[in-house]
UniProtKB/Swiss-Prot annotation:
Main location: cytoplasm
Necessary cofactors: Mg(2+)
Record: active site: 251
PTM characteristics: Some glutamate residues at the C-terminus are polyglycylated, resulting in polyglycine chains on the gamma-carboxyl group. Glycylation is mainly limited to tubulin incorporated into axonemes (cilia and flagella) whereas glutamylation is prevalent in neuronal cells, centrioles, axonemes, and the mitotic spindle. Both modifications can coexist on the same protein on adjacent residues, and lowering polyglycylation levels increases polyglutamylation, and reciprocally. The precise function of polyglycylation is still unclear. Some glutamate residues at the C-terminus are polyglutamylated, resulting in polyglutamate chains on the gamma-carboxyl group. Polyglutamylation plays a key role in microtubule severing by spastin (SPAST). SPAST preferentially recognizes and acts on microtubules decorated with short polyglutamate tails: severing activity by SPAST increases as the number of glutamates per tubulin rises from one to eight, but decreases beyond this glutamylation threshold.
Entry's free-text remark on domains: The MREC motif may be critical for tubulin autoregulation.
Record-linked InterPro entries: Alpha_tubulin, Tub_FtsZ_C, Tubulin, Tubulin/FtsZ-like_C, Tubulin/FtsZ_2-layer-sand-dom, Tubulin/FtsZ_GTPase_sf, Tubulin_C, Tubulin_CS
Protein name: Tubulin alpha-2 chain
Superkingdom of source: Eukaryota
Lineage: Eukaryota, Metazoa, Chordata, Craniata, Vertebrata
Amino acid sequence: MRECISVHIGQAGVQIGNACWELFCLEHSIQPDGTFSDPPSSDDSFATFFRETSMSKYVPRAIMVDLEPTVVDEVRTGTYRHLFHPEQLITGKEDAANNYARGHYTVGKDKVDMVSDRIRKLADSCSGLQGFLIFHSFGGGTGSGFTSLLMERLSVEYGKKSKLEFAIYPAPQASSAVVEPYNSVLTTHTTLEHSDCVFMVDNEAIYDICHRNLDIERPTYTNLNRLISQIVSSITASLRFDGALNVDLTEFQTNLVPFPRIHFPLVTYAPIISSDRAYHEQLSVAEITSSCFEPNNQMVKCDPQQGKYMACCMLYRGDVVPKDVNVAIAAIKTNRSLQFVDWCPTGFKVGINYQPPIPTPGGDLAQVQRAVCMLSNTTAIAEAWARLDHKFDLMYAKRAFVHWYVSEGMEEGEFAEAREDLAALEKDYDEVATDLFEDENEAGDS
């Protein structure tokens, strides 16, 4: 088997975890107590995410960690309390108080050995561990500080195993702390060399999608997380179901990451429509494919027209045949002004999974016959870093709030180091897009 272990860290990670496991259970007909509602089919691909116990119960290969108990306690007492083994839910007594240094140096340090042991137990129950999916936010103290501490540890203990992150990018609408830019820059710097691929989700983009496409007046975290869980489900469907293509974690990297540091694909999902609208719309493969190139459906606010594509991966699910996909992609190539970098063939990697998306009961999304999730590596995503770096600079110029970090044992030099690394990352993106212009001009002159 090629198992994946999911690690949910901090409030955002755990709450997204709740939404994801609720959806995975629905998709695989597993009840909240871990038993099957329908007898399992011969396809046991779901075992990549669930482990069977001696009592024929299915337990998620997952761990939830938070440095304070309230959010994980909701799992311990909620509908899915019997799904997880108590040892998979780990909490501390005091939170990281939105402070990266507390999550990484003081409070987090005390917990990392225990978390590491629990992950080791999960890994030992796998026959061929493929890698880790790590869910967290950039802005929280636990999400930023503890995640980077744990990723360093995973790199040491499981060297070559893939590590993919689903990371929540801070947004003004749903901001929970003024120091989010500090935490985000620090965690990105620390995890850059440990992470293989990071799918960023910008809360502001998701907030707007819920508001605009799903007619939710004031979207809550529950609304946001349910939408995020559909995206995670699409990206991981090929690992959990027998599919035609894209079955492996390493395959994502091979197809999406041209250089080790340029590992932040842009995620777009379609169709995102409410039940009322779905009633009146028939969404063909061509239409949903075209929707993926609308900036309104992106999970991070940026303008792909201003950037260049390095790679594109289309993951379809439901009632989709390859012929329709080929026609749809050919139309995109002719109708849209997609700019690919010169050194990259304009091939689209396609995955098709025949399992249609299942909406959560009582959720906001309509039941549709087919959906697509596009993962594209585009230089436009550097805009997200530029926004974050700008906010970091405004505060750091005044050294605002820095004493809270230093008093937790962090050195002030780490701020400058992290900021320089992100400046280098922005420059890397620039070079990927522009280096080749110079070559063209020289070729044109000669």
